[in-house]
């Protein structure tokens, strides 16, 4: 992890020194993305594996052509339909998150067309709906779960035009602190996003 953070800092310093190639573009943009993959829901002595699908709506501020900051809203939907050793199944949970991220794009695959990007940040998450059904069909519902995570992305972005960018990423979120009950650990998500710079 220390090596990864040092690498990001090096990329950041290089990115901040880059000259603006598209000075006529606004420093503001938006991003819409969706992802799907495996996740683990833990809490109250449970560890349930399942699938999660996510959507994100982000606002971007381009500090330079290589570095941008992002914040917005993410929605995560978790589902586990198989019987586990603890006799829990039909588990459904919905989490809302507010991320603050910094994204670096430095290593160009094709000049001014495609680049490898790295993103890291912090994210506050809260369960807005949680339902756990047991083997005897009893149910428990909770909406008080709150946890902090570190979202990370690595992927490739391709410029469709001066304004539009299409990205493909491998994403994860490492849980760092849980305040109540349940938390969602993303083991590895495939994410697709479209960015528009004003």
Language model features by range: what are they?
Residues 1-26:
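Cleavable N-terminal export/targeting peptides
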Residues 18-61, 197:
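Short glycine/proline- and aromatic-enriched beta-strand/turn motifs that initiate or cap beta-hairpins
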Residues 19-28, 65-66, 107-115, 160-164:
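Short loop/turn motifs that connect adjacent beta-strands in outer-membrane beta-barrel proteins
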Residues 26-28, 49-53, 92-98, 114, ...:
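Residues that define the transmembrane beta-barrel architecture of outer-membrane proteins
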Residues 30-38, 71-75, 118-126, 156, ...:
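Transmembrane beta-barrel strands of outer-membrane/channel proteins
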Residues 41-48, 81-87, 128-137, 179-186:
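Outer-membrane beta-barrel translocator domains and adjoining extracellular loop/strand segments
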Residues 60-135, 195-198:
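Gram-negative (and chloroplast) outer-membrane scaffold detector with strong preference
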Residues 72, 76-83, 93-95, 141, ...:
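Predominantly the C-terminal beta-signal and adjacent terminal strand-loop region
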